[in-house]
Amino acid sequence: MNALSIPTWMVHVSSVIEWIVAIALVSRYATKAGYGHWRALAWGMVPALVSATCACTWHFFDNASQLDWLVTLQALTTVIGNITLCLAAWWIYRQSAQPSAPKP
């Protein structure tokens, strides 16, 4: 656990917490506002959360060489996360551009 300084740990852990809170808030917004297509954004954020968790786990175990596969998994989930976030943004744009029926 000594691989990172305390301020760097604070950044890593707060990033994971930030992703969790953001996913929860976006999901809640989708439900409360009735915009189900926003839920795609919440799901699109999950791979980025997995990526951040991989980084924290690897550093927690002092960058152990036995856990080098976590670095590969982090890279993969970062790419997947970037793609899913892009697709979610496109989906939200597409749904928002369609004329909607008036709400009662």
Curated annotation (Swiss-Prot):
One of its GO terms (cellular component) is plasma membrane. It is found in: Cell membrane. The chain crosses the membrane at residues 6-26, 41-61, 73-93. InterPro entries: Uncharacterised_Ycf49 (IPR019634). Keywords: Cell membrane, Membrane, Transmembrane, Transmembrane helix. It is a multi-pass membrane protein. It comes from the Bacteria. Belongs to the ycf49 family. This is Ycf49-like protein. It comes from Synechocystis sp. (strain ATCC 27184 / PCC 6803 / Kazusa).
